[in-house]
């Protein structure tokens, strides 16, 4: 099957299932089971319940999908530092 035939949807992760699978509520209202794409596994991108994601699906099986992108959260005040990381100190140049 060619990549041009895949359909993309956006949704919200509602539940984390075993074996790197997720239950996703699509914006259209349908609920599907999606697995993590290989590039997300390789780059160790973690997905939690409540994250907005983009799903790729085959038009032949609309019950399963591949999670290809996790959208950045829009929480205010984000500094970009990992959670739990100590604050960085100021350095003076000589």
Swiss-Prot record:
Keyword tRNA processing: no
Domain of life: Bacteria
Disulphide bridges: none
Annotated S1-like domain residues: 1-72
Comp. bias (Low complexity): 82-94
InterPro entries, per database record: NA-bd_OB-fold, RNA-binding_domain_S1_IF1, TIF_IF1
Annotated compartments: Cytoplasm
Gene Ontology cellular component list: cytosol
Region ranges (Disordered): 71-94
Keywords: Cytoplasm, Initiation factor, Protein biosynthesis, RNA-binding, rRNA-binding
One Pfam family cited in the UniProt record for this chain: eIF-1a
Keyword 4Fe-4S appears in the UniProt entry: no
GO molecular function: ribosome binding; rRNA binding; translation initiation factor activity
General function of this protein: One of the essential components for the initiation of protein synthesis. Stabilizes the binding of IF-2 and IF-3 on the 30S subunit to which N-formylmethionyl-tRNA(fMet) subsequently binds. Helps modulate mRNA selection, yielding the 30S pre-initiation complex (PIC). Upon addition of the 50S ribosomal subunit IF-1, IF-2 and IF-3 are released leaving the mature 70S translation initiation complex.
Subunit structure: Component of the 30S ribosomal translation pre-initiation complex which assembles on the 30S ribosome in the order IF-2 and IF-3, IF-1 and N-formylmethionyl-tRNA(fMet); mRNA recruitment can occur at any time during PIC assembly.
Family: Belongs to the IF-1 family.
Protein name, per record: Translation initiation factor IF-1
């Amino acid at each position: 099957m060619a990549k041009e035939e895949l359909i993309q949807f956006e949704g919200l992760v509602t539940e984390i299932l075993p074996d790197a699978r997720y239950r996703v509520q699509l914006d259209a209202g349908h609920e599907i089971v999606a697995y993590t794409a290989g590039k997300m596994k390789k780059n160790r991108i973690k997905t939690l319940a409540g994250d907005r994601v983009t799903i790729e699906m085959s038009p032949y099986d609309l019950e399963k999908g591949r999670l290809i992108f996790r959208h950045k959260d829009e929480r205010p005040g984000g500094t970009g530092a990992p959670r739990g990381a100590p604050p960085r100190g100021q350095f003076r140049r000589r």
